[in-house]
Amino acid sequence: MSSFTPSPDHAGEFRQALGQFATGVTVVTAASDTGPIAMTVNSFTSVSLDPPLILWCPAHVSERHDAFVAASHFAIHVLKEDQTELARHFAMNGADFSPIDLIHGAHDVPLFEDCLARFECATHTVHRGGDHSIMIGEVLRVTLDPGAPLAFQAGHFGRFTPKS
């Protein structure tokens, strides 16, 4: 086991250490001045049950960052284990919704019909967090579908295998 102090000289190692934490995979969507936008995100977590709050963190360097920060509403879609290609697609292209059946929810937010869970949110607050923004959303509606989640760890997609 190695140890280091996070610094620009150790940025790659710091990122590698963060990648050891296995997460689920989400796609965040919103309406923007130029049309619907999306972004694959694994920086998603619950904040509060009462009121129902969640957060996610877009990078400042993302060309979609400013549009998401300006959005009054957004949706977070938790992907199913068979949606790896969808995760890859929206990691690279945030405006092409051709691979998915899309409906529009309140405030014209684009919604995926096929996902494990969907959280429709109003933007509650946005904080600066280093090279990312921390977007906190108040959850207005939840849609839940049974199934298994898509997982992500150390730069690779996979599946979660529960232990009995």
Q: Where are each of the predicted segments found?
A:
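Basic, polyanion-binding surface patches
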Residues: 1-164
